[in-house]
Amino acid sequence: TAEVAPHHFTLTDDAVKIVVGGPMMGVAQFDLHAPVMKATSGILVLTKDEVAENPETPCLRCGQCVGACPLNLMPTKLARYSQLNRFDDAEGSGITVCMECGTCSYTCPANIPLVQWIRLGKQKVLQMQKERTAVK
């Protein structure tokens, strides 16, 4: 459960990043106290040499994320709507359809964390939908 690392494996001193859930759809952890559940698909521990330090730069409008999206969504548009708190627009553009596979972020030459912004926007849209349903 909560403290798997000390009980089941030993981290070396050069471990700098821990990702729970796998390399594509996983979430970086900030400490070792994150719970590991039955549904946790993997734990990835990276050293400094394995972590790319590529800073985020402005969007180039190259369209690589759009071409990579298996659902033919427009990740840059969805992420931008999330950044601007335009959740109605995000909903209208199909943000809830996104399966959060991460291919958009992986292919982005500007290193924009598209899937993280989309995930945030999707949570907000789902919350709005739930509130609308509760009001009726």
Can you describe what each PLM-predicted range is?
Residues T1-A110, V115-Q127, E131-K136:
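Redox cofactor-anchoring modules in respiratory/redox and cofactor-processing assemblies
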